[in-house]
Amino acid sequence: MKATQMILVASLAAFAADANGKWTAVFDTQIGEQNYTYEFKSDGKKLTGTATSKGNPAVQIEEGKVDGDKISFVENFSYQGNPIRIEYTGKFDGADKIQFTRKVADYAVEEIVANRVK
């Protein structure tokens, strides 16, 4: 029985994704190509860090969570004087790739891929 429990615990730990570090994504949007760098730090299920689009200052991510192979956070910033909320939900695809759905306020929903910088 104890051996079964230990195997279960070990297998669950293997599914916990490591979000820590720098990630990049380049993707097309309604306003043109976007080039992003994300810097993540996870502590248990809590995720903190920054999202930086090329040519703009870093934005602190909010509401960040990592749960197994799932990741989510919010990027709030101002574009041409208008507040914009971008909601990210994603799933790790191996150790070095995250498949994200990015909901940009009521304007767009985008599928993007972030790759770990090694």
Regions found by a protein language model. Give the residues of each.
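Central antiparallel beta-sheet cores of small beta-barrel/beta-sandwich binding domains
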Residues: 17-93, 99-118
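Absolute protein N-terminus
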Residues: 1-2, 16-18
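Hydrophobic h-region of N-terminal signal peptides that target proteins for export
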Residues: 9-17
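Sec-dependent signal peptide recognition
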Residues: 1-9
